[in-house]
Amino acid sequence: MSKKSVRLHPGDILAGVTVALVLIPQALAYATLAGVPAGRGLFAAALAPLAAALFASSPYLATGPTALTSLLTFGALSAIAVPASSDYVLLAGLLAFLVGVMRIVMGLVRAGPIAYLMSRPVMLGFTAGAAVVIVASQIPAVVGATASGGNPLLAALGVLRDPGSWKAEAIPVAIAAALLIAGGKRVHHLFPGILAAVVLALGFTALVGYEGAVLGDIGSGLPTISLALPWGSLRELLAPALVIALVGFAEPASIARRYSILDRLRWDPNRELIGQGAANLLSGMGGGFPVGGSLSRTALARDAGARTRISGATTGLVVLLFLPFVTVLETLPVAVLAAAIIVTVSDLVQVPRFRDYYRYARLQFAVALATFLLTVILAPHIERAVIIGILLAILAHLWRELHLSIPAWRDGDVLHLAPKGVLYFASAPGLEDAFGKLLGEHPSANGLNLHLGGLGRVDLTGALALRGLMDDAREAGFEVELSDVPPQAKKIIARVVDNSV
């Protein structure tokens, strides 16, 4: 990024403060979603933007606690420690530290494009499934009940079937908060609906009283940077850390890439990986948990006037300065945070995109739907759904390229084959089968013309199969000719195929 891009712009301070006012209540909510005490969300919200601002490539990307990363954190840790316990908090810090190290290493070895392993169908299905799981996990808080463990959907159904466990006060508070947050977006895109909901809820509890669940003791003070983490659990957390490092980067990568195109800015995914890695590293050492890039807060920062990475640093600094006064939020109804989470993640379910995949790409639709269902069924261990979804996407890709499209025809005594697709080890036999079928229909032909212009890629096995077919055809008395060899395949065909190209 040029030196000009890091000079202070008047809009950076305003944007940073604006995002911080939204981030503070969101961080509390996402901390509870991740299974850590609410105050730990503020530690992550303060430290992550400060670290990311030092290395980030995007001038807008708002780093901090996010819904998806928080849910992945809960899925990774809830099976090995009791949520909100001291052991759980330390494990969350170690998990963030490992995510940070992995992202920094990937950035240094220039593995930024690895974010594209999360294909669009997988991301579509995963984010939609995660949104359903997140909404289900917040239903007990909305009705003022206590949820059991296990699958959030089953827990939510259990709560809904037991109205006797509800707290009547929580429901209208949650509904009012949801309407204010969602309605605020319609009034103006910069309206801080979640902040307004928090302020009004605090005023309500102070003036009228509230008997439902509140945040309670949050604790105050600044985070302490330390490497006193449970290193004995390192091996156990490597796999989930890798999943979060990859999946959690796919979202900020798509956000940063989109805005770089809209604003004609250069964006470096490798540098962004390092920035996101540094954010997780500092969050982990400072008592936080894994963090990522937020689409809603990034859009808010850009619309509020952010022009450089200083806006992110401002956000972190504002949250840091607020930490000594965080006790003012202790009477905040938990139902308000639940409503905020539900409204925030509701946009992740993109039904029109599912419909488009169904209409135009049934195989990709199947991958998206399978990933969605797996995410819902396997919750809270949604990282497994991600892994299976990626494998399904790879299998779908291989299946699609397994079959070459091979138009074939006869012109006089010459047979013509025009393979289209990728000629590689799995699809090569299809070319030989097509020639055999055409030869069986026209046994009197004596010429073969292979039109290769439709091939996208040719690997060694494909080139060897091509040479074998040509040798067999010549041995059978055919005159063989290659035409329209694509530029990307000329080198390997010239080396492998005994023909001048």
Kindly give the residue locations of the regions a language model identified.
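Transmembrane helical cores of multi-pass ion-transport proteins
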Residues: 1-396, 400-405
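The feature marks cytosolic C-terminal regulatory regions of anion transporters and related permeases
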Residues: 347-496
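Short acidic-hydrophobic, aromatic-tinged amphipathic segments that line or gate anion-handling sites
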Residues: 499-501
